[in-house]
């Protein structure tokens, strides 16, 4: 996973609340066994509407999604995060995230930045007044910058650390490789053990 420090991109106003993972990517698109190729399923139920925000320029090139409260609720679906990232999003800003979505985002390299709902409303207003407005998310300082506006955001320390270090689950496990090998080496011969790679 690539480390995340700062990201700047076009802000996309998604003026919807309670966007669950089935709305982010419907189940019919979950048939792949890889982590890529889900961008076509992103918001598929809404993208058939020509007036949907991702069908409008310059928002179709956006990488910072500004969503209403309760974004990513519903079933545990890593594909929701993968679809957002495959489309090009690197940051999602909301006043409240589904817990599982927030965890999946941090594990995959997507920044889920939690701000006050008043700040979401302000960002929507700024974006709609200046389509193409660049928004910058600085994870180290935990601030969002849009034009002259600077807003703090919340993220749990563990997720922030993983993003800053670029650590997915495999990379975290590999950091403990010496301990794992020592444990395996100390196990009694009759206990199950992992085999070395060929």
UniProtKB/Swiss-Prot annotation:
Protein family per UniProt: Belongs to the LeuD family. LeuD type 1 subfamily.
InterPro entries, sorted: 3-IsopropMal_deHydase_ssu (IPR004431), Aconitase/3IPM_dehydase_swvl (IPR015928), AconitaseA/IPMdHydase_ssu_swvl (IPR000573), IPMI_Swivel (IPR033940), LeuD (IPR050075)
Any one Gene Ontology cellular component term annotated for this protein: 3-isopropylmalate dehydratase complex
Organism field: Mycobacterium tuberculosis (strain ATCC 25618 / H37Rv)
Pfam families with a match to the protein in the record: Aconitase_C
Protein's GO biological process: L-leucine biosynthetic process
Catalytic reaction(s) noted: (2R,3S)-3-isopropylmalate = (2S)-2-isopropylmalate
Subunit description: Heterodimer of LeuC and LeuD.
UniProt keyword Lyase present: yes
Class of the enzyme per the UniProt entry, highest EC level: lyase
Superkingdom of the organism of origin: Bacteria
Gene name of this polypeptide: leuD
CDD domains: IPMI_Swivel
One GO MF term attached to the UniProt entry: 3-isopropylmalate dehydratase activity
EC number: 4.2.1.33
Pathway the protein contributes to: Amino-acid biosynthesis; L-leucine biosynthesis; L-leucine from 3-methyl-2-oxobutanoate: step 2/4
Protein name: 3-isopropylmalate dehydratase small subunit
Cross-link Isoglutamyl lysine isopeptide (Lys-Gln) (interchain with Q-Cter in protein Pup): where in chain: 154
Keyword Ubl conjugation: yes
Keywords: Amino-acid biosynthesis, Branched-chain amino acid biosynthesis, Isopeptide bond, Leucine biosynthesis, Lyase, Ubl conjugation
Function: Catalyzes the isomerization between 2-isopropylmalate and 3-isopropylmalate, via the formation of 2-isopropylmaleate.
């Amino acid at each position: 996973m690539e480390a995340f420090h700062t990201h700047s991109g076009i802000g996309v106003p998604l003026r919807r609340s309670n966007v669950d993972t089935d709305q982010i990517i419907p189940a019919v698109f979950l048939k792949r066994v890889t982590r890529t190729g889900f961008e076509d399923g992103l918001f598929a139920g809404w993208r058939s509407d020509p007036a949907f925000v991702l069908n409008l320029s310059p928002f179709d090139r956006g990488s910072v999604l500004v969503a209403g409260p309760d974004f990513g609720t519903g079933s545990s679906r890593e594909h929701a995060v993968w679809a957002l990232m495959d489309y090009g999003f690197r940051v999602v800003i909301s006043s409240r995230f589904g817990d599982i979505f927030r965890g999946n985002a941090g594990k995959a390299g997507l920044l889920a930045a939690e701000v006050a709902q008043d700040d979401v409303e302000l960002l929507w207003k700024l974006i709609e007044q200046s389509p193409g407005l660049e928004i910058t998310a600085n994870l180290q300082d935990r601030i969002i910058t849009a034009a002259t506006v600077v807003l703090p955001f919340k993220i749990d320390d563990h997720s922030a650390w993983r993003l800053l270090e670029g650590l997915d689950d495999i990379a975290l496990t590999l950091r403990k490789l010496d301990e794992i090998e020592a444990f395996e080496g100390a196990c009694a011969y009759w206990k199950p053990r992992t085999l070395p790679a060929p």
